[in-house]
A protein has these predicted regions:
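C-terminal helical subdomain
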Residues: 163, 170-171, 187-225
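Residue(s) in the substrate-gating loop at a strand-loop-helix junction
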Residues: 130
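Conserved mid-core segment of classical short-chain dehydrogenase/reductases
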Residues: 57, 80-96, 139-142
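Active-site-adjacent segment of SDR/Rossmann-fold oxidoreductases
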Residues: 135, 156-166
């Protein structure tokens, strides 16, 4: 949905084979990446739940069984939490859920993918982090903490994969015109970064030679001091 759907569609149009992990399989019926709209063998769809590690394992196994391997992983799942620093008793579950989805699930997926990325000789990991992984605005303590942790993971993966020609790119947008931003009234939707823009950036990163892959791309659709 949103960013992920646009990235997948862009890569299909560019001739790449893709393996998509999504929680709601039914949501892809009739969409731009519905497998029925593409030649056989171009796209496989897998059930993926960020809170269930077994679904990540099955996703990778299905991909390797179908394609023989893979060279890129793009992480764009996430959840918005409004839990503040002075959280209420009982909010701990929300905090842990946010950390599990925005941080640990991505760690699990990249760890499980690591050997395949090494084997490819030019592995690429792209992570949709957020400007909230670079600075904290307001009092979204749970969300910002999860994104700061994710940025730290990206830096560590970059270090770990450097000699194996694995390159990591952390994309850090502010508001993107997706369902997550649908209730934002302070900024017109047309003034936000569009999902298609993120897809274009990902496409460019995947085409770049190893020596030119950027680690961090910060995107501001609104002015920040």
């Amino acid at each position: 949905r949103g960013i992920g759907l646009n990235i997948a569609h862009k890569e299909l149009k560019e001739g790449n084979r893709i393996s998509v992990g999504i929680r709601d399989l039914e949501s892809l019926k009739g969409s731009a990446i519905d497998p029925k709209k593409w030649p056989e063998g171009k796209i496989i769809i897998n059930h993926y739940d960020a809170l269930k590690k077994i679904t990540a394992e099955n996703w990778i196994k299905n991909t390797v069984d179908e394609f023989g391997g893979f060279d890129s992983v793009i992480n764009c799942s996430g959840v918005l939490s409004k839990v503040p620093f002075l959280y209420k008793d009982g909010d701990e579950e929300d905090i842990l859920n946010t950390l599990n989805i925005n941080f640990l699930a991505i760690w699990h997926l990249c760890r499980l993918s690591w050997d395949h990325l090494c084997t490819s000789g030019r592995g690429r990991i792209i992570v949709l982090v957020s400007m909230s992984g670079k600075r904290s605005k307001g009092d979204l303590a749970a969300y910002s903490s999860s994104k700061f942790a994710l940025m730290g993971l990206c830096q560590t993966m970059k270090n770990k994969g450097w000699e194996k020609n694995i390159r990591v790119s952390a994309i850090c947008p502010s508001w993107v015109n997706t369902k997550m931003a649908q209730n934002i009234s302070s900024l017109d939707k047309s003034s936000m970064t569009q999902p298609e823009d993120i897809a274009e950036i990902c496409s460019t990163i995947l085409k770049l030679p190893t020596q030119s892959v950027p680690f961090e791309i910060a995107l501001n659709c609104n002015y920040e001091i």
